[in-house]
Amino acid sequence: MPTPVAAARQCLSPAAVPALDAAVASSRRRAHAQTTSLHLISSLLAPPAPPLLRDALARARSAAYSPRVQLKALDLCFAVSLDRLPSVSASSSSSGAADEPPVSNSLMAAIKRSQANQRRNPDTFHFYHQAATAQTPAAVKVELSHLVLAILDDPVVSRVFAEAGFRSGDIKLAILRPAPPMPLLGRLPTRTRPPPLFLCSFAAADDADVPSPAGNLAGAGEENCRRIAEILSRGRNPMLVGVGAASAADDFAAASPYRIIHVDPNTIDRSDLGVAAAMASATSGLIISIGDLKQLVPDEDAEAQEKGRRVVAEVTRVLETHSKVGRVWVMGWSATYETYLAFLSKFPLVDKDWDLQLLPITAVHAAATAGPAAAAAGLMPPATTVAAFSKPAASLMDSFVPFGGFLCDNYEENSLTANSCPQALRCQQCNDKYEQEVATIISASGITAEDHHQGGLPSLLQNGSMMGPNNGFDPVKARDDRMVLNSKILNLRKKWNEYCLRLHQDHQRINRDPYKPFPRYIGVPTDKERSANSSKGSESVGVQKDVIKPCAVSAVHSSSTARPISSPSVTNKRNEDLVLNLQARHSKSDENLQERGMQSQHGTLSNVDNPDDHVSPSSAAPVETDLVLGTPRECSSKGSSSTCSKRVEDSERSVHLVPKKVDDLNLKHPQLSVQPNSCSWSSINVGKTSHSTLHSVASGGFSAFGQWQKRSPLAAQNSDLSNYKLLVERLFKVVGRQEEALSAICESIVRCRSTESRRGPNRNDIWLCFHGSDSMAKKRIAVALAELMHGSKDNLIYLDLNLQDWDDSSFRGKTGIDCIVEQLSKKRQSVLFLDNIDRADCLVQDSLSDAIKSGRFQDMRGKVVDINDSIVVLSRSMIQGSKNGLEEGLSFSEEKILATRGHRLKILVEPGRAITSGCPSGKVVVSPRHFLTKIQASLCSGSISKRKLSISDDQEKLQESPSSSKRLHRTSSVPFDLNLPVDEDEPLDADDDSSSHENSYGNTEKSIDALLHSVDGSINFKPFDFDKLADDMLQEFSNILRKNLGSECMLEIDVGAMEQILAAAWKSEEDRKPVPTWLEQVFARSLDELKLKRKHVSSSTLRLVACEDTVPAVKGDGLGVLLPPRIILDC
């Protein structure tokens, strides 16, 4: 039923009421029975109406037609549509001439939809508080823009627009994103104006190749990257929409200095967003790419919809946690506007929670044909350092006009200098003097530091009202002053370049410009940095430039004086003051070095912690620092040797960890000393990047634990701490235990990778020694290090140096060192794990000692192999500082578990009897925790007949003395030399206590101790608690026994069978737990079979024993060779 006009008028805002009145007048004039949406749109197209719809049509028209022709066609289409509407009769018209035509149901439905949209959007709805009476028709007044958006959804109106060549989606987007003010747009030069927003391509299909009017526009990809970077600089998250959105995202990822992590519904469960976001504060930043929005809004697949919700929930959690303390953004794209609206309708809170900003992408450059396909497949390239924004000098000069273009002054002058003088290299001394003169010119020009900082910001971010005629801002004068200033700076740079090239030809030169891969506006400062930088004045211009620009990663020769660009990792006032303080101190140190003729680059520097010797003469010059974390063993003076040794002891001390998340680990980052001007890694290693699964914490493609240039002491410490925590978390996920050992290992690795090696600047190898038992944990750590540090598990080289294990045919005719050299020649970058180092022969030990000193191995034939980028792990079963290698107080030893082989198991059924609490050997394991189920395990230690089927009830006594089981198994590492005569004076009954053997063994121990004292880190491993594992296994047996046979049945497990089960559980991987599977599938099935064969088995005593014959290996059963696929039943 039509609605009266008065009732509809009460639902509209004062700005929308005149439009409805004009529509009603048009309907009355045409003698129509109702006022429809066509009347309202037709009235808005008339000149007296507000220009909202006309401006949107001007920007949303098709480029295939002339604007005048298309708009005239639209007027004609609406006139024809109105003429087709039915008219009332003449008598009805004359009788009701004074009555207003009521509002049609379609128009009233559009008004109601507008009210609902405004009510759901708290940012745009307005309440007109009227008298709180029941007759109040509505509390939300519909604005004109929302009314037009709702009417455009009417199929009748959309069909009329389509006949004229318009699309409702394009008109909606034009209304939501109004054009910038005309005076601002008119002041832009022709070359820097953005392309017109012809959004007809937004409704194209995702995979359609629709030609764009800006498709051949030069620099379209560059323009899109600048627009994306502008949104990031505002602290908002871009959402790209249009046919060119995929290629724009691909181009930005290729040229961005940020780390980009792609997240989609299929990889959200395996992604480490929390870890990467935690590291973002110590790097240039992190962008989470959710890819195509179409993946998050599937049509009917319930599972895919659930995955999409998990993606949105995880990204929201990361943004809420790390957006305020780190540099974390989110970015996505969609080829159609309808997909974007469907995404917002499915997740209505995302627009506000993520702080999204819609960015239309209508320009697709021809060189990016492969970009959208790659982006659509979810392949976002990693962050690289590509100079993607090089523009001709003419267009760059045009961008100096105020409010025009997004390039800042600093980037333009760098580009101009690079074009005019390609060999713009200066030594350190000339560069400092040049920067001092630049700071003087800037301070004398009257342009404050705030204005200079705003010169590199987009025009809409600069302070002040740019459009006000009486606000005191003269754009022409600002443009002229800025052009004059930049001209002076260019002349200064050219002068100092020529001066340095002419007079300082033998000096080390620096070139900081090529290390700026991205315009400086991409270094997004935090709010605290902006406020701090804007209030410092003109003398802090140089410091500001260093704080906001991104980090450029490079590796240079140790003798070079190139100073890296500082990282924008300062996120609070306290850390910022620390960085500025260290930079000021180092500035004075650099000045003193320059006055001495740059001769102290390789000498001993003064202590950086002395405040009296490091007072910055002027903070006007830009200062940077290349302070890196020094080696704890390297001290600047003899007086600090005791302090350094104490730091070494502290750094090698293990820290207790709680095995949860990395943020919950009670970690202590390495105790590293900070030394100024430390030598960086050698230039010969540049490009030798390891293919690590860990992404770099800084852009440049380097491994997270490879070589990088230090930015500042604070940034270096933050980076090392992040790497340390990340490495601990990854190793703990693989190993699952030995928290203290993992902490010490990661501390040693980060310390060695972060500082110059104590063996020389060109040495990148790391030597570790693992002391103690738990050999499975050691091997898992070695495998994890090979995968994390060198990209694959295949980069692990494992060799057991025990003399008794060299009977294999593959080792025949080879010595231990020959095998090491052969394997290292195949895998240059690897983890070399040498087990049982204390049982190796003297030749291997001597070769290892030489390799630690020289960094290379040499076999018996003279072949030499380098170990420069490898990690060498030496392992021994004896704990450091202990003379006994046995685990005291444990019922099961690792030596016995390792010697266990897979035997068949058998269940013996005996009549019910009470299990005594002891056996003749006195070794009984009865856990009070499992006594509730009346299950006990009688573990008779060392029985000779424990693997035989004929086991007596009284359990045979031990045949060997307890002392023999506790005797440490030692194999003499001194080989026999047949060329030496036999010592006749040696007694025939010589044993281990003879003096000759003690001397040889003592010499071997000294050689091993000297070798192990030369490693970078010694780590003690705790013995594995097999008793606790046995208790867990007993509990599993108890649960299955109670479930299948009841609580009255008793089970007695032979020690041989128990050792076999413990070995299977210990040697299995963490993600594969074969023992619970075996219990459920094999043991439980055997109990069911036994229950069918024996009637009163529930009141009997069962014994699980091991047989003599071994279990044949069966492929694909998943149980391993230690667990038989079936258990023999003795009924």
Swiss-Prot record:
- Motif EAR 2 covers 799-803
SUPFAM superfamilies per the record? P-loop containing nucleoside triphosphate hydrolases
Q: What PROSITE patterns does this protein map onto? A: CLP_R
Query: Could you say which tissues express the protein in this record?
Result: Expressed in the shoot bases of seedlings, young leaves, axillary buds and young panicles. Expressed in young roots vasculature, culms, internodes and nodes, preferentially in the parenchyma cells surrounding the xylem.
Q: Residue ranges for motif EAR 3?
A: 976-981
Record region (Repeat 2):
103-181
* Start and end residues of each stretch annotated as Repeat 1: 12-85
Q: How is it modified after translation?
A: Polyubiquitinated. Strigolactone, but not karrikin, triggers rapid SCF(D3)-dependent degradation via the proteasome.
Ranges for domain Clp R: 8-181
Q: Is Ubl conjugation tagged as a keyword? A: yes
**From start to end residue, where is composition biased (Basic and acidic residues)?**
646-655
**Keyword vocabulary terms for this entry:** Nucleus, Repeat, Ubl conjugation
Q: Where is the composition biased (Polar residues)?
A: 597-609
For bias kind Acidic residues, which ranges apply? 982-993
Assembly behavior: Interacts with D3. Interacts with D14. The interaction with D14 is enhanced in the presence of strigolactones. The interaction with D14 occurs in the presence of (2'R) stereoisomers of strigolactones, but not (2'S) stereoisomers. Interacts with the TOPLESS-related proteins TPR1, TPR2 and TPR3. Interacts with SPL14/IPA1.
Any idea what job this protein has? Repressor of strigolactones (SL) signaling. Subjected to a negative feedback control of SL signaling. Suppresses the transcriptional activation activity of SPL14/IPA1 in SL signaling. Acts with SPL14/IPA1 to mediate the SL-regulated tiller development. Subject to a negative feedback regulation by SPL14/IPA1, which binds to D53 promoter to repress D53 gene expression.
Q: Which PANTHER family match?
A: CHAPERONE PROTEIN CLPD, CHLOROPLASTIC, PROTEIN SMAX1-LIKE 6
Protein's name in the database: Protein DWARF 53
Gene encoding it?
A: D53
